[in-house]
């Protein structure tokens, strides 16, 4: 048991070192096109690490210490909502399974999460797309809103097991254009009426 624990710890240390090195390369590449993320006037402090749990997602970015200069107040009826569009501390976590992929795919994931640290880029809206487009054009990345796990595994010469529907999912949804499957526990009629496939924009249908 101790040997297994030591082996897993060593593997995680190797992944962590690789992650830090690739992050440094991303920082240098951004600097080469005029984006200095070490400039605290532009962006807050960024810390990057492996995710503690091996989640299905590629990575995530958590924010702390909101910048009062970027405070946004919106009103809806009698209610007032406060949001912040810049944070002084940002914490990026990358899933361990991502670290098994090609370096270019790992860097693409890192760059995606770095963009979320920029002001007004908490979501995948206009500002996120602007930065992603600029980075893709000038550095040859492929930063997008969604990743394609199956294709990324193939590019990395790794076997990918296509997930099948399980008892946890009541509804199986298929894109009529590209054939991708999505699984949901609940069904809303607006899903097929107003939503489209995140990969190709095709219409969705419920499979029986």
What is each residue range found by the language model?
Residues 3-108, 117-208:
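Active-site-proximal or metal-binding-adjacent scaffold patches in catalytic folds
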Residues 113:
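Walker B catalytic acidic pair
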């Amino acid at each position: 048991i101790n040997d297994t624990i030591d082996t897993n710890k060593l593997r995680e240390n190797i992944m962590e070192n690789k992650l830090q090195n690739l992050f440094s390369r991303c920082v240098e590449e951004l600097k080469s096109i005029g984006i200095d993320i070490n400039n605290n006037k532009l962006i807050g402090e960024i810390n990057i690490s492996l995710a503690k749990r091996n989640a299905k997602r590629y990575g995530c970015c958590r924010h702390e210490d909101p910048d009062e200069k970027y405070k946004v107040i919106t009103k809806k009826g009698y209610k007032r909502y406060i949001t912040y569009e810049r944070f002084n501390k940002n914490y990026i976590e990358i899933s361990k399974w991502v670290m098994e992929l090609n370096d270019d795919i790992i860097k693409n994931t890192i760059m995606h999460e770095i963009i979320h640290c920029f002001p007004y880029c908490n979501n995948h809206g206009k500002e996120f797309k602007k930065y992603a487009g600029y980075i893709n054009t000038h550095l040859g990345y492929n930063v997008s809103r969604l990743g394609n796990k199956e294709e990324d595994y193939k590019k990395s010469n790794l076997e990918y097991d296509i997930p099948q529907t399980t008892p946890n999912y009541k509804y199986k949804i298929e894109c009529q254009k590209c054939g991708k499957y999505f699984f949901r526990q609940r069904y809303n009629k607006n899903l097929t009426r107003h939503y489209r496939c995140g990969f190709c924009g095709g219409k969705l249908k419920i499979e029986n």
